[in-house]
């Protein structure tokens, strides 16, 4: 049985036994919710999400494109792949670089 994580995202149909799954495990989510594109899924149980944004350059009064890469935990019930648009939510630190978890996947 999936639990309510407090975000307006659909509950995955597939079940999993991952302890770090926000729906089927005990991982609480809080803080930021970010959307981005999965650029790598080669790590076991993790994905790299690229977030694009605009940065204002005051000298030229223009915007420039920038991007950042965020490592996120990928629960087996969601199974995000390269090219998918995902929503990731902030959680407690899961490792040295992972402090986000995938909560929604929009297949590409």
UniProtKB/Swiss-Prot annotation:
Gene3D superfamilies: 2.40.50.1000. One of its GO terms (molecular function) is rRNA binding. One of its GO terms (biological process) is translation. It holds the Pfam family Ribosomal_S17. Keywords: Ribonucleoprotein, Ribosomal protein, RNA-binding, rRNA-binding. InterPro entries: NA-bd_OB-fold (IPR012340), Ribosomal_uS17 (IPR000266), Ribosomal_uS17_arc/euk (IPR028333), Ribosomal_uS17_archaeal (IPR019978), Ribosomal_uS17_CS (IPR019979). CDD domains: Ribosomal_uS17. One of its GO terms (cellular component) is cytosolic small ribosomal subunit. SUPFAM superfamilies: Nucleic acid-binding proteins. Part of the 30S ribosomal subunit. One of the primary rRNA binding proteins, it binds specifically to the 5'-end of 16S ribosomal RNA. PANTHER family: 40S RIBOSOMAL PROTEIN S11 FAMILY MEMBER, 40S RIBOSOMAL PROTEIN S11-RELATED. Belongs to the universal ribosomal protein uS17 family. This is Small ribosomal subunit protein uS17. It comes from Methanospirillum hungatei JF-1 (strain ATCC 27890 / DSM 864 / NBRC 100397 / JF-1).
């Amino acid at each position: 049985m999936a639990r309510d994580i407090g975000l307006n995202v659909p509950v995955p149909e597939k079940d999993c036994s991952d302890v770090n799954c926000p729906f089927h495990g005990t991982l609480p989510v809080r803080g930021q919710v970010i959307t981005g594109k999965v650029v790598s899924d080669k790590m076991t149980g993790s994905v790299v999400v690229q977030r694009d944004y605009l940065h204002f350059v005051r000298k030229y009064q223009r915007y420039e494109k920038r991007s950042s890469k965020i490592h996120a935990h990928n629960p087996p019930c969601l199974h995000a792949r390269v090219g998918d648009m995902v929503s990731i939510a902030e959680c407690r630190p899961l490792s040295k670089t992972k402090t986000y978890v995938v909560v929604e996947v929009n297949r590409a």
